[in-house]
Design a protein with these regions (language model features):
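Catalytic domains of carbohydrate-active enzymes, especially glycoside hydrolases
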Residues: 30-46, 211
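Residue-level signal for inorganic ion chemistry
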Residues: 39, 101, 145
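N-terminal amphipathic alpha-helix/helix-capping segment at the start of soluble metabolic enzymes
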Residues: 1-16, 30, 237
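Short, basic, low-complexity termini and linkers enriched in Ser/Thr/Gly/Pro
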Residues: 1-2, 131-141, 237
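Generic enzyme active-site microenvironment
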Residues: 8, 42, 81, 144, ...
Length: 237
């Protein structure tokens, strides 16, 4: 089992779980350093909240938020991902040292694919956008399929998506991002505040890894890394 951990840094004032905590560049850079120390293999920088009801922003504002952070994090010796659906932001991020573009919407995928030409960058995209990719087999080594847990989905749909990971993994690398989304509360019936469902979040990450996910995108890096290390040790003994 080989599953990397992607740590989330939201450089936003309004993300659903930690909006505003890391909005200043120095705070976001410190957050990234802490996640790396906790064992993150990849840092995912986001400048726009994708929570339901969030106010969209233009690519210029998004880039003004993440650009100064990306330049510093790219020098920390870790893979850097940029969470954006704006091709303009993605293009600038690649030039600034990003290794992965994480796009949660299908519509921009054709433009994002153009950015792969002449660059070694990789692309995360919704599995629903697979039909938009011409000759996907030639690009598979540079793509990650995202089942899109928690994006306008019911509890039953989220569970089915998680159970579909083995089949998705036959098509290519799978990235699962279910951290701090409502699925844990939906599955347990708990009404605790955001960030208090660490056990459930880690359980989903471990499940995803066991089912064949190549990357889990999480807020609670330290706990997830520890759980995956224990799982690997148990499998090896």
């Amino acid at each position: 089992m080989s599953c990397r951990v992607m740590g989330i840094v939201n450089v936003t004032p309004d993300s659903f779980s930690d909006g505003g905590q890391f909005f200043k560049p120095e705070e976001a850079i410190r957050r990234a350093k802490n996640l790396i120390a906790d064992g993150a293999d990849i840092i995912d920088l986001g400048g726009e909240s994708t929570r339901p009801g969030a106010t969209p922003i233009g690519w210029e504002e998004e880039w003004n938020r993440i650009g100064p952070v990306l330049e510093k994090v790219a020098d920390l010796g870790v893979l850097v991902s940029v969470d954006t659906y704006h091709p303009e932001t993605a293009e600038r991020a690649i030039k600034a040292g990003a290794h992965i573009i994480n796009c949660v919407y299908a519509e921009p995928i054709p433009e994002m694919l153009k950015l792969l030409k002449g660059n070694e960058v990789e692309l995360v995209f919704p599995v629903s956008a697979l039909p938009l990719i011409p000759n996907p087999q030639s690009l598979i080594p540079r793509l990650y399929l995202d089942p899109m847990i928690g994006f306008n989905t019911t509890r039953e749909e989220d569970v089915e998506l998680l159970r579909s990971i083995p089949e998705l993994a036959k098509k290519g690398r799978v990235l699962v991002g279910a951290s701090r989304k409502r699925i844990v509360k939906k599955m347990t019936g708990e009404k605790s505040s955001v960030g208090k469902n660490i056990g459930g979040n880690v359980a989903i990450a471990v499940w995803a890894a066991m089912q064949g996910a190549s990357v889990v995108r999480v807020h609670d890096v330290k706990e997830t890394v520890q759980a995956l290390r224990v799982l690997r040790a148990l499998r090896e003994e």
